[in-house]
């Protein structure tokens, strides 16, 4: 979807992805101490619900979105509270985030919107470039494992996910999950930046 269309969605209040509540899969991940408060980047921050929830728990968060109206709404939610949370209107694929390396990157339904394999590979490479050594990327991705449908947000197969990530990232966990607010299937994908390239298969002799 072009940047203009995202902005139009926020102008019209047509935001089916915005539940107004922090994503349960993220909440469970944080509450299980799988990531501790650290410098964090959220890509596709929307109106800031998840970013603010993280900041309330001690994370130092930068939230990015291509839609300036989304960022305006997120800043209104922040409303001068004493939190380490900032929002910026920025195209993550084209511009470098201003805060430097992040130890935790999060997106919910952003990676999945890119239809071309090259775009998804580029997205993953950009995440790898912004991750600090040992940093984690948690991506929640619409899954093709759900029932057939004619319309709705993009969905990706496990193969599409791994093909995009593996050149630049080591996949630590890829499992089926659900976007509970919409009762739809999802992938829970946790990865980290590669320190050595992925190796080709060896021949059995």
Q: Model regions: which residues?
A:
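Class I (Rossmann-like) S-adenosyl-L-methionine-dependent methyltransferase catalytic domain
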Residues: 1-41, 47-99, 116-130, 135-205
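Short, flexible, mixed-charge acidic loops at enzyme active sites
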Residues: 102
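A conserved beta-strand element that flanks and buttresses the S-adenosyl-L-methionine
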Residues: 106
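Short catalytic micro-motifs in class I SAM-dependent methyltransferases
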Residues: 109-113
């Amino acid at each position: 979807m072009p940047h203009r269309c995202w902005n139009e969605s926020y102008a019209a209040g047509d935001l089916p992805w915005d539940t107004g509540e922090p994503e349960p899969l993220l909440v469970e991940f944080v509450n299980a101490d799988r990531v501790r408060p650290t410098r964090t980047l959220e890509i596709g921050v929307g109106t800031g619900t998840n970013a603010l929830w993280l900041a309330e728990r001690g994370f130092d968060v930068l939230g990015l979105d291509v839609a300036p109206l989304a960022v305006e709404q997120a800043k209104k939610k922040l409303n001068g509270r004493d939190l380490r949370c900032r929002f910026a209107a920025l195209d993550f694929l084209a511009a470098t985030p201003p805060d430097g390396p992040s130890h935790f990157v999060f997106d919910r339904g952003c990676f999945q919107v890119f239809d071309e394999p090259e775009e998804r590979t580029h997205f993953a490479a950009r995440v790898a470039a912004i991750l600090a050594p040992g940093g984690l990327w948690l991506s929640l991705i619409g899954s093709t494992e759900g029932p057939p449908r004619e319309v709705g947000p993009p969905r990706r197969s496990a193969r599409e996910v791994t093909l995009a990530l593996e050149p630049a990232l080591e996949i630590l966990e890829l499992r089926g999950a659900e976007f509970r607010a919409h009762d739809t299937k999802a992938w829970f994908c946790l990865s980290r930046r590669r320190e050595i390239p992925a190796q080709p298969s060896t021949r059995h002799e």
